[in-house]
A protein has these predicted regions:
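Beta1-alpha1 glycine-rich phosphate/pyrophosphate-binding loop at the start
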Residues: 233-300, 355-398, 409, 465-470
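A Rossmann-like FAD-binding core segment of flavoenzymes
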Residues: 280-325, 332-334, 339-343, 348-349, ...
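C-terminal, flexible cofactor-proximal segment of oxidoreductases
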Residues: 446-494
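Redox-cofactor binding/interface segments in oxidoreductases and associated redox assembly factors
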Residues: 10, 95-96, 163, 317-319, ...
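Internal hydrophobic alpha-helix adjacent to the cofactor/substrate pocket in enzyme cavities
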Residues: 170, 175-176, 243, 373-382, ...
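Glycine-rich dinucleotide-binding loop and its adjacent helix/turn
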Residues: 211-224, 288-291, 299, 320, ...
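Flavin-dependent oxidoreductase catalytic cores
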Residues: 1-234, 238, 246-249, 253-254, ...
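Glycine/Thr-rich phosphate-binding loops of Rossmann-like dinucleotide-binding domains
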Residues: 18, 71, 104, 171, ...
Length: 494
Protein backbone atom coordinates (compact mmCIF):
# COMPACT_ATOMS: atom_id res chain seq x y z
CA UNK A 1 0.00 0.00 0.00
CA UNK A 2 2.87 2.39 0.78
CA UNK A 3 4.09 1.87 -2.78
CA UNK A 4 0.78 3.19 -4.11
CA UNK A 5 -0.48 -0.07 -5.59
CA UNK A 6 -4.03 -1.35 -5.22
CA UNK A 7 -3.13 -5.00 -5.09
CA UNK A 8 -0.55 -7.77 -5.11
CA UNK A 9 -0.47 -10.83 -7.34
CA UNK A 10 1.46 -13.93 -6.29
CA UNK A 11 2.96 -15.51 -9.39
CA UNK A 12 2.60 -19.21 -8.65
CA UNK A 13 2.46 -20.40 -12.25
CA UNK A 14 4.96 -21.75 -14.78
CA UNK A 15 7.16 -23.80 -12.49
CA UNK A 16 8.16 -20.87 -10.27
CA UNK A 17 8.80 -21.35 -6.54
CA UNK A 18 5.15 -21.51 -5.35
CA UNK A 19 4.27 -24.11 -7.98
CA UNK A 20 7.36 -26.13 -7.06
CA UNK A 21 5.95 -26.54 -3.55
CA UNK A 22 2.61 -27.58 -5.07
CA UNK A 23 4.07 -30.26 -7.34
CA UNK A 24 4.60 -33.82 -6.02
CA UNK A 25 7.14 -34.44 -8.79
CA UNK A 26 9.35 -31.63 -7.42
CA UNK A 27 8.45 -31.29 -3.74
CA UNK A 28 10.00 -34.25 -1.88
CA UNK A 29 9.97 -32.59 1.53
CA UNK A 30 8.97 -34.72 4.51
CA UNK A 31 8.10 -31.87 6.89
CA UNK A 32 4.90 -29.81 7.13
CA UNK A 33 5.55 -28.38 3.62
CA UNK A 34 5.56 -31.70 1.78
CA UNK A 35 3.84 -35.05 1.54
CA UNK A 36 0.05 -34.74 1.23
CA UNK A 37 -1.77 -32.07 -0.88
CA UNK A 38 -2.59 -29.90 2.14
CA UNK A 39 1.06 -29.74 3.19
CA UNK A 40 2.18 -28.95 -0.37
CA UNK A 41 -0.28 -26.02 -0.41
CA UNK A 42 0.99 -24.73 2.93
CA UNK A 43 3.81 -22.55 1.53
CA UNK A 44 1.47 -20.67 -0.82
CA UNK A 45 -1.18 -20.40 1.90
CA UNK A 46 1.33 -18.88 4.31
CA UNK A 47 2.54 -16.40 1.68
CA UNK A 48 -1.06 -15.25 1.25
CA UNK A 49 -1.54 -15.05 5.02
CA UNK A 50 1.65 -13.02 5.52
CA UNK A 51 0.58 -10.50 2.87
CA UNK A 52 -2.87 -10.20 4.45
CA UNK A 53 -1.35 -9.72 7.90
CA UNK A 54 1.01 -6.93 6.86
CA UNK A 55 -1.25 -4.95 4.51
CA UNK A 56 -4.51 -3.00 4.81
CA UNK A 57 -7.69 -5.03 4.49
CA UNK A 58 -8.68 -3.26 1.29
CA UNK A 59 -5.51 -4.36 -0.53
CA UNK A 60 -6.40 -6.79 -3.33
CA UNK A 61 -4.56 -10.11 -3.18
CA UNK A 62 -4.61 -12.53 -6.10
CA UNK A 63 -2.62 -15.48 -7.36
CA UNK A 64 -1.64 -16.57 -10.83
CA UNK A 65 -1.68 -20.35 -11.21
CA UNK A 66 -1.37 -22.68 -14.18
CA UNK A 67 -4.66 -24.47 -14.72
CA UNK A 68 -2.72 -27.22 -16.47
CA UNK A 69 1.06 -27.46 -16.76
CA UNK A 70 0.83 -29.55 -19.96
CA UNK A 71 3.81 -31.55 -18.76
CA UNK A 72 3.89 -35.33 -18.35
CA UNK A 73 5.48 -34.98 -14.91
CA UNK A 74 3.63 -31.86 -13.90
CA UNK A 75 0.32 -30.81 -12.38
CA UNK A 76 -2.64 -31.62 -14.59
CA UNK A 77 -6.06 -29.98 -14.76
CA UNK A 78 -7.60 -32.13 -12.03
CA UNK A 79 -4.77 -31.47 -9.57
CA UNK A 80 -4.79 -27.75 -10.30
CA UNK A 81 -8.55 -27.54 -9.89
CA UNK A 82 -8.27 -28.85 -6.33
CA UNK A 83 -5.35 -26.54 -5.54
CA UNK A 84 -7.22 -23.49 -6.86
CA UNK A 85 -10.44 -24.47 -5.10
CA UNK A 86 -8.67 -24.79 -1.74
CA UNK A 87 -6.70 -21.54 -2.05
CA UNK A 88 -9.61 -19.47 -3.39
CA UNK A 89 -11.25 -18.51 -0.04
CA UNK A 90 -8.13 -16.57 1.01
CA UNK A 91 -7.86 -14.71 -2.31
CA UNK A 92 -9.74 -11.89 -4.00
CA UNK A 93 -9.12 -13.39 -7.41
CA UNK A 94 -7.44 -16.26 -9.26
CA UNK A 95 -5.53 -15.63 -12.48
CA UNK A 96 -5.67 -18.80 -14.59
CA UNK A 97 -2.98 -19.43 -17.18
CA UNK A 98 -1.22 -22.62 -18.39
CA UNK A 99 2.18 -24.22 -18.78
CA UNK A 100 5.44 -24.65 -16.89
CA UNK A 101 9.07 -23.72 -17.42
CA UNK A 102 10.04 -27.22 -16.24
CA UNK A 103 9.90 -28.67 -19.77
CA UNK A 104 10.01 -27.54 -23.39
CA UNK A 105 6.50 -28.82 -24.04
CA UNK A 106 5.10 -27.14 -20.95
CA UNK A 107 6.89 -23.86 -21.60
CA UNK A 108 5.12 -23.48 -24.95
CA UNK A 109 2.05 -22.49 -22.93
CA UNK A 110 3.79 -19.70 -21.02
CA UNK A 111 3.20 -17.47 -24.05
CA UNK A 112 1.21 -19.77 -26.35
CA UNK A 113 1.92 -19.32 -30.07
CA UNK A 114 -0.55 -19.22 -32.95
CA UNK A 115 -0.85 -23.01 -33.06
CA UNK A 116 -2.74 -22.93 -29.75
CA UNK A 117 -6.49 -22.31 -29.94
CA UNK A 118 -7.87 -18.92 -28.93
CA UNK A 119 -9.10 -18.80 -25.34
CA UNK A 120 -8.19 -22.44 -24.77
CA UNK A 121 -8.13 -22.16 -20.96
CA UNK A 122 -11.69 -20.81 -20.75
CA UNK A 123 -13.25 -24.28 -20.21
CA UNK A 124 -11.06 -24.73 -17.11
CA UNK A 125 -11.81 -21.24 -15.80
CA UNK A 126 -15.54 -21.86 -16.32
CA UNK A 127 -15.39 -25.02 -14.22
CA UNK A 128 -13.32 -23.24 -11.58
CA UNK A 129 -15.61 -20.22 -11.43
CA UNK A 130 -18.53 -22.45 -10.50
CA UNK A 131 -16.54 -23.85 -7.57
CA UNK A 132 -14.91 -20.80 -5.97
CA UNK A 133 -17.93 -18.72 -5.01
CA UNK A 134 -17.17 -15.02 -4.52
CA UNK A 135 -13.52 -15.27 -5.60
CA UNK A 136 -13.15 -13.62 -9.00
CA UNK A 137 -11.57 -15.58 -11.85
CA UNK A 138 -9.34 -14.08 -14.55
CA UNK A 139 -8.35 -16.22 -17.53
CA UNK A 140 -5.54 -15.56 -20.01
CA UNK A 141 -3.84 -17.33 -22.90
CA UNK A 142 -4.40 -16.57 -26.60
CA UNK A 143 -7.31 -14.18 -26.12
CA UNK A 144 -6.50 -11.69 -28.86
CA UNK A 145 -9.85 -10.10 -29.73
CA UNK A 146 -12.31 -8.20 -27.51
CA UNK A 147 -15.24 -10.16 -28.92
CA UNK A 148 -13.59 -13.37 -27.68
CA UNK A 149 -13.07 -11.84 -24.23
CA UNK A 150 -16.65 -10.56 -24.10
CA UNK A 151 -17.97 -14.01 -25.01
CA UNK A 152 -15.95 -15.64 -22.23
CA UNK A 153 -17.24 -13.15 -19.66
CA UNK A 154 -20.81 -13.17 -20.98
CA UNK A 155 -21.01 -16.96 -20.80
CA UNK A 156 -19.76 -16.94 -17.21
CA UNK A 157 -16.45 -18.66 -17.94
CA UNK A 158 -14.53 -15.87 -16.18
CA UNK A 159 -14.95 -12.44 -14.62
CA UNK A 160 -11.98 -10.94 -16.45
CA UNK A 161 -9.68 -11.77 -19.36
CA UNK A 162 -5.95 -11.09 -19.67
CA UNK A 163 -4.91 -9.83 -23.12
CA UNK A 164 -1.24 -8.82 -22.89
CA UNK A 165 -0.02 -9.40 -26.44
CA UNK A 166 -3.26 -8.04 -27.88
CA UNK A 167 -2.53 -4.75 -26.10
CA UNK A 168 1.09 -4.69 -27.28
CA UNK A 169 -0.10 -5.21 -30.85
CA UNK A 170 -2.81 -2.56 -30.62
CA UNK A 171 -2.60 -0.32 -27.54
CA UNK A 172 -5.86 1.35 -28.60
CA UNK A 173 -7.75 -1.95 -28.70
CA UNK A 174 -9.99 -1.23 -25.66
CA UNK A 175 -10.87 2.24 -26.95
CA UNK A 176 -11.66 0.90 -30.42
CA UNK A 177 -13.80 -1.87 -28.94
CA UNK A 178 -15.74 0.57 -26.76
CA UNK A 179 -16.43 2.73 -29.83
CA UNK A 180 -17.60 -0.26 -31.88
CA UNK A 181 -14.57 -0.05 -34.18
CA UNK A 182 -13.82 -3.77 -33.92
CA UNK A 183 -12.81 -4.08 -37.57
CA UNK A 184 -10.11 -1.45 -37.01
CA UNK A 185 -8.36 -3.48 -34.31
CA UNK A 186 -4.92 -4.77 -35.22
CA UNK A 187 -5.22 -8.37 -34.05
CA UNK A 188 -2.26 -10.19 -32.50
CA UNK A 189 -1.22 -13.21 -34.59
CA UNK A 190 0.65 -15.05 -31.83
CA UNK A 191 4.02 -15.01 -33.60
CA UNK A 192 5.91 -14.22 -30.34
CA UNK A 193 8.75 -12.59 -32.25
CA UNK A 194 9.05 -9.05 -30.95
CA UNK A 195 7.14 -9.37 -27.66
CA UNK A 196 8.32 -12.31 -25.57
CA UNK A 197 11.03 -12.95 -28.18
CA UNK A 198 12.54 -9.54 -27.50
CA UNK A 199 12.15 -9.91 -23.75
CA UNK A 200 14.09 -13.17 -23.78
CA UNK A 201 16.91 -11.47 -25.70
CA UNK A 202 17.04 -8.57 -23.27
CA UNK A 203 15.56 -6.18 -25.84
CA UNK A 204 12.65 -3.76 -25.40
CA UNK A 205 9.27 -5.38 -26.01
CA UNK A 206 7.54 -4.41 -29.25
CA UNK A 207 5.40 -5.97 -32.00
CA UNK A 208 6.29 -6.97 -35.55
CA UNK A 209 3.03 -5.46 -36.79
CA UNK A 210 3.28 -2.23 -34.80
CA UNK A 211 6.88 -1.20 -34.16
CA UNK A 212 5.66 1.99 -32.48
CA UNK A 213 4.75 -0.21 -29.51
CA UNK A 214 7.54 0.00 -26.94
CA UNK A 215 8.95 3.04 -28.75
CA UNK A 216 6.20 5.46 -27.76
CA UNK A 217 8.53 8.31 -26.82
CA UNK A 218 10.27 8.14 -30.18
CA UNK A 219 7.10 7.90 -32.25
CA UNK A 220 4.56 9.60 -29.97
CA UNK A 221 4.07 12.39 -32.51
CA UNK A 222 4.78 11.58 -36.15
CA UNK A 223 5.83 14.85 -37.80
CA UNK A 224 3.29 16.23 -40.30
CA UNK A 225 4.48 17.21 -43.76
CA UNK A 226 4.64 20.99 -44.23
CA UNK A 227 3.74 20.45 -47.88
CA UNK A 228 1.97 17.30 -49.07
CA UNK A 229 4.22 15.34 -51.39
CA UNK A 230 3.39 12.80 -54.08
CA UNK A 231 4.89 9.59 -52.69
CA UNK A 232 5.21 6.36 -54.63
CA UNK A 233 5.77 3.13 -52.70
CA UNK A 234 6.89 0.21 -54.85
CA UNK A 235 6.06 -3.22 -53.45
CA UNK A 236 3.10 -4.44 -51.44
CA UNK A 237 4.70 -6.69 -48.85
CA UNK A 238 4.72 -5.78 -45.15
CA UNK A 239 7.54 -3.24 -45.66
CA UNK A 240 5.80 -1.44 -48.50
CA UNK A 241 2.41 -1.43 -46.82
CA UNK A 242 3.81 0.04 -43.60
CA UNK A 243 5.77 2.63 -45.61
CA UNK A 244 2.63 3.69 -47.47
CA UNK A 245 0.63 3.92 -44.23
CA UNK A 246 3.36 5.99 -42.58
CA UNK A 247 3.66 8.36 -45.53
CA UNK A 248 -0.11 8.89 -45.63
CA UNK A 249 -0.38 9.39 -41.88
CA UNK A 250 2.16 12.21 -42.08
CA UNK A 251 0.05 14.14 -44.58
CA UNK A 252 1.27 13.01 -47.99
CA UNK A 253 -0.53 11.78 -51.10
CA UNK A 254 0.50 8.13 -51.38
CA UNK A 255 0.22 5.51 -54.11
CA UNK A 256 1.40 1.92 -53.73
CA UNK A 257 2.30 -0.18 -56.77
CA UNK A 258 2.41 -3.95 -56.44
CA UNK A 259 3.69 -6.06 -59.32
CA UNK A 260 1.53 -9.11 -58.54
CA UNK A 261 -2.22 -9.50 -58.14
CA UNK A 262 -2.12 -9.61 -54.31
CA UNK A 263 -0.64 -7.68 -51.44
CA UNK A 264 1.38 -9.57 -48.85
CA UNK A 265 4.81 -10.41 -50.23
CA UNK A 266 6.62 -13.09 -48.22
CA UNK A 267 3.75 -13.19 -45.69
CA UNK A 268 1.73 -14.99 -48.38
CA UNK A 269 4.30 -17.79 -48.24
CA UNK A 270 4.05 -17.96 -44.46
CA UNK A 271 0.28 -18.32 -44.38
CA UNK A 272 0.41 -21.10 -46.98
CA UNK A 273 2.31 -23.44 -44.65
CA UNK A 274 0.75 -25.75 -42.05
CA UNK A 275 0.16 -24.13 -38.65
CA UNK A 276 1.16 -20.70 -39.96
CA UNK A 277 -2.19 -19.67 -41.45
CA UNK A 278 -2.73 -16.98 -38.83
CA UNK A 279 0.43 -15.21 -39.95
CA UNK A 280 -1.67 -13.98 -42.85
CA UNK A 281 -3.36 -11.72 -40.31
CA UNK A 282 -0.50 -9.28 -40.78
CA UNK A 283 -1.67 -8.81 -44.37
CA UNK A 284 -5.29 -8.26 -43.37
CA UNK A 285 -4.31 -5.80 -40.65
CA UNK A 286 -2.02 -3.76 -42.91
CA UNK A 287 -4.57 -3.77 -45.75
CA UNK A 288 -7.13 -2.30 -43.36
CA UNK A 289 -4.68 0.39 -42.29
CA UNK A 290 -3.98 1.22 -45.95
CA UNK A 291 -7.69 1.78 -46.59
CA UNK A 292 -8.16 3.92 -43.50
CA UNK A 293 -5.07 5.99 -44.35
CA UNK A 294 -6.41 6.70 -47.84
CA UNK A 295 -3.56 5.05 -49.75
CA UNK A 296 -4.23 4.40 -53.45
CA UNK A 297 -3.27 0.79 -54.24
CA UNK A 298 -2.54 -0.35 -57.78
CA UNK A 299 -2.04 -4.10 -58.32
CA UNK A 300 -0.41 -5.72 -61.36
CA UNK A 301 1.66 -2.56 -61.74
CA UNK A 302 5.23 -2.77 -62.99
CA UNK A 303 7.72 -0.18 -61.82
CA UNK A 304 10.11 0.92 -64.55
CA UNK A 305 11.69 4.16 -65.70
CA UNK A 306 8.95 5.20 -68.17
CA UNK A 307 6.14 4.47 -65.68
CA UNK A 308 7.97 6.30 -62.92
CA UNK A 309 8.58 9.32 -65.14
CA UNK A 310 4.92 9.41 -66.12
CA UNK A 311 3.80 9.21 -62.49
CA UNK A 312 6.32 11.92 -61.52
CA UNK A 313 6.70 11.20 -57.79
CA UNK A 314 8.30 13.59 -55.33
CA UNK A 315 9.75 10.63 -53.39
CA UNK A 316 9.97 6.86 -53.86
CA UNK A 317 10.15 4.03 -51.34
CA UNK A 318 11.51 0.83 -52.87
CA UNK A 319 10.08 -2.20 -51.08
CA UNK A 320 10.51 -4.56 -54.01
CA UNK A 321 11.23 -7.54 -51.79
CA UNK A 322 13.45 -10.47 -52.63
CA UNK A 323 13.70 -13.20 -55.23
CA UNK A 324 14.38 -16.89 -54.91
CA UNK A 325 17.94 -18.13 -55.04
CA UNK A 326 19.30 -21.63 -55.42
CA UNK A 327 22.85 -22.47 -54.34
CA UNK A 328 25.06 -24.44 -56.72
CA UNK A 329 24.90 -28.14 -55.78
CA UNK A 330 27.61 -30.61 -56.76
CA UNK A 331 26.38 -33.50 -58.87
CA UNK A 332 22.63 -33.33 -59.29
CA UNK A 333 22.19 -36.50 -61.36
CA UNK A 334 19.92 -39.22 -60.00
CA UNK A 335 18.22 -37.04 -57.38
CA UNK A 336 15.33 -34.68 -58.05
CA UNK A 337 16.24 -31.25 -56.63
CA UNK A 338 13.52 -28.72 -55.86
CA UNK A 339 13.35 -25.27 -54.31
CA UNK A 340 10.84 -24.91 -51.47
CA UNK A 341 8.80 -22.47 -53.56
CA UNK A 342 8.35 -25.24 -56.15
CA UNK A 343 6.49 -27.27 -53.52
CA UNK A 344 4.12 -24.41 -52.75
CA UNK A 345 3.56 -23.99 -56.48
CA UNK A 346 2.33 -27.59 -56.65
CA UNK A 347 5.43 -29.62 -57.52
CA UNK A 348 5.26 -33.25 -56.39
CA UNK A 349 8.08 -35.07 -54.66
CA UNK A 350 9.08 -38.69 -54.51
CA UNK A 351 8.31 -40.88 -51.51
CA UNK A 352 11.62 -40.40 -49.72
CA UNK A 353 12.45 -36.74 -49.20
CA UNK A 354 15.38 -34.89 -47.67
CA UNK A 355 14.83 -31.22 -46.83
CA UNK A 356 17.90 -29.05 -46.44
CA UNK A 357 17.18 -26.21 -44.03
CA UNK A 358 19.70 -23.46 -44.70
CA UNK A 359 17.71 -20.79 -42.80
CA UNK A 360 16.57 -22.48 -39.53
CA UNK A 361 13.36 -20.46 -39.55
CA UNK A 362 9.75 -21.55 -40.08
CA UNK A 363 9.92 -22.42 -43.79
CA UNK A 364 11.72 -25.78 -43.63
CA UNK A 365 9.59 -26.78 -40.64
CA UNK A 366 6.48 -26.00 -42.66
CA UNK A 367 7.85 -27.93 -45.65
CA UNK A 368 8.53 -30.96 -43.45
CA UNK A 369 5.03 -30.84 -42.00
CA UNK A 370 3.41 -30.35 -45.39
CA UNK A 371 5.24 -33.21 -47.09
CA UNK A 372 4.96 -35.56 -44.12
CA UNK A 373 1.22 -34.95 -43.91
CA UNK A 374 0.96 -35.76 -47.62
CA UNK A 375 2.49 -39.19 -46.96
CA UNK A 376 6.18 -38.71 -47.76
CA UNK A 377 9.00 -40.06 -45.61
CA UNK A 378 10.82 -36.90 -44.57
CA UNK A 379 14.32 -36.32 -43.25
CA UNK A 380 15.23 -32.77 -42.23
CA UNK A 381 18.89 -31.73 -42.39
CA UNK A 382 19.41 -28.48 -40.50
CA UNK A 383 22.21 -25.96 -40.98
CA UNK A 384 22.14 -25.13 -37.27
CA UNK A 385 21.62 -26.47 -33.77
CA UNK A 386 18.00 -27.51 -34.33
CA UNK A 387 15.00 -26.80 -36.55
CA UNK A 388 13.65 -23.31 -35.93
CA UNK A 389 16.81 -22.12 -34.20
CA UNK A 390 16.23 -18.60 -35.57
CA UNK A 391 12.67 -18.28 -34.25
CA UNK A 392 11.29 -17.70 -30.75
CA UNK A 393 11.72 -20.80 -28.59
CA UNK A 394 8.04 -21.41 -27.71
CA UNK A 395 7.18 -21.32 -31.42
CA UNK A 396 10.20 -23.50 -32.17
CA UNK A 397 9.52 -26.10 -29.47
CA UNK A 398 5.88 -26.46 -30.48
CA UNK A 399 7.06 -27.08 -34.04
CA UNK A 400 9.71 -29.61 -33.00
CA UNK A 401 7.03 -31.51 -31.09
CA UNK A 402 4.86 -31.65 -34.22
CA UNK A 403 7.78 -32.88 -36.33
CA UNK A 404 8.50 -35.61 -33.79
CA UNK A 405 4.89 -36.79 -33.80
CA UNK A 406 4.92 -36.87 -37.59
CA UNK A 407 8.01 -39.08 -37.56
CA UNK A 408 10.28 -36.54 -39.26
CA UNK A 409 13.91 -37.54 -38.76
CA UNK A 410 16.07 -34.52 -37.90
CA UNK A 411 19.84 -34.14 -38.22
CA UNK A 412 21.53 -30.95 -37.00
CA UNK A 413 24.81 -29.20 -37.89
CA UNK A 414 24.46 -30.06 -41.59
CA UNK A 415 26.02 -28.22 -44.54
CA UNK A 416 24.94 -29.41 -47.97
CA UNK A 417 27.78 -30.59 -50.19
CA UNK A 418 26.20 -32.39 -53.12
CA UNK A 419 23.69 -34.95 -54.39
CA UNK A 420 23.72 -37.76 -56.93
CA UNK A 421 22.52 -41.34 -57.43
CA UNK A 422 19.74 -41.08 -54.80
CA UNK A 423 22.30 -39.95 -52.22
CA UNK A 424 22.73 -36.57 -50.54
CA UNK A 425 26.10 -35.59 -49.08
CA UNK A 426 26.60 -33.25 -46.12
CA UNK A 427 29.41 -32.05 -43.88
CA UNK A 428 28.84 -31.97 -40.12
CA UNK A 429 29.77 -28.37 -39.34
CA UNK A 430 30.97 -29.08 -35.81
CA UNK A 431 32.84 -32.34 -36.41
CA UNK A 432 33.90 -31.44 -39.99
CA UNK A 433 33.13 -34.99 -41.05
CA UNK A 434 30.97 -36.30 -43.91
CA UNK A 435 27.34 -37.32 -43.38
CA UNK A 436 25.65 -39.37 -46.09
CA UNK A 437 21.88 -39.79 -46.49
CA UNK A 438 20.97 -42.57 -48.91
CA UNK A 439 17.84 -43.76 -50.67
CA UNK A 440 16.65 -40.25 -51.51
CA UNK A 441 14.09 -39.53 -54.22
CA UNK A 442 13.82 -35.77 -53.81
CA UNK A 443 16.00 -33.11 -52.21
CA UNK A 444 14.10 -29.95 -51.24
CA UNK A 445 16.39 -27.00 -50.60
CA UNK A 446 15.27 -24.11 -48.36
CA UNK A 447 17.84 -21.37 -49.04
CA UNK A 448 17.78 -17.64 -48.29
CA UNK A 449 16.47 -15.18 -50.85
CA UNK A 450 18.35 -12.42 -52.65
CA UNK A 451 17.35 -8.74 -52.70
CA UNK A 452 15.31 -7.51 -55.67
CA UNK A 453 16.77 -4.04 -56.24
CA UNK A 454 16.96 -3.63 -60.03
CA UNK A 455 15.11 -0.28 -60.14
CA UNK A 456 17.63 1.33 -57.82
CA UNK A 457 20.22 1.43 -60.62
CA UNK A 458 18.44 4.09 -62.68
CA UNK A 459 16.67 5.71 -59.73
CA UNK A 460 20.04 6.82 -58.35
CA UNK A 461 20.61 9.11 -61.32
CA UNK A 462 17.03 10.38 -61.52
CA UNK A 463 17.39 12.91 -58.73
CA UNK A 464 14.25 11.62 -57.02
CA UNK A 465 14.72 11.12 -53.25
CA UNK A 466 14.29 7.44 -52.39
CA UNK A 467 14.89 4.77 -49.78
CA UNK A 468 15.31 1.00 -50.07
CA UNK A 469 13.64 -1.00 -47.29
CA UNK A 470 12.74 -4.51 -46.20
CA UNK A 471 13.95 -7.54 -48.13
CA UNK A 472 15.01 -5.28 -51.01
CA UNK A 473 17.68 -3.96 -48.65
CA UNK A 474 18.50 -7.37 -47.13
CA UNK A 475 16.20 -10.40 -46.83
CA UNK A 476 15.20 -10.80 -43.17
CA UNK A 477 11.90 -11.14 -41.32
CA UNK A 478 8.59 -9.28 -41.25
CA UNK A 479 9.74 -7.48 -38.12
CA UNK A 480 12.61 -5.68 -39.84
CA UNK A 481 10.45 -5.07 -42.91
CA UNK A 482 7.67 -3.30 -41.01
CA UNK A 483 10.13 -1.43 -38.79
CA UNK A 484 11.96 -0.05 -41.82
CA UNK A 485 8.65 0.81 -43.46
CA UNK A 486 8.12 3.12 -40.51
CA UNK A 487 11.60 4.51 -39.83
CA UNK A 488 12.99 4.86 -43.36
CA UNK A 489 9.83 6.55 -44.58
CA UNK A 490 9.88 9.08 -41.75
CA UNK A 491 13.56 9.70 -42.45
CA UNK A 492 12.85 10.24 -46.16
CA UNK A 493 9.91 12.58 -45.72
CA UNK A 494 10.86 14.67 -42.69
Amino acid sequence: AAAGVDGVEIVGSHGYLPSQFLSPSINFRTDQYGGNPENRRRFVAEVIQSIRASCPEELIVGARLSGDEFDSGGLDEDAMFEICRNLAPSLDYLNVIAGTSASSGGSVHIVPPMTVSNGYMAPFSAKLKQAVGPTAVLVAGRINQPQDAEKIVREGAADMCGMTRAMICDPRMPAKASLGQVDDIRACIGCNQACIGHAQLGLPISCIQYPESGRELRFAEKPRAEVSRRVLVVGGGPAGMKAAITAAETGNSVTLWERSSRLGGQALLAQALPNREEFGGIINNLEGELRRAGVSVSLNSEFDQPNCSEFSPDAVVLATGSRRWMPPIEGGEGVEILHHEDILAGAKTGQRVVIYDWRTDWIAIGMAELLSQSGADVRLAVNGVCPGFAIQNYVRDAAIARLYRLGVETTAFMRLYGAEDRTVYFVHTAAQEPVVLEDVDTLVVVPPNQPEVGPADWLKSSGIPYRIIGDALAPRTAEEAVYEGLTATLELLT
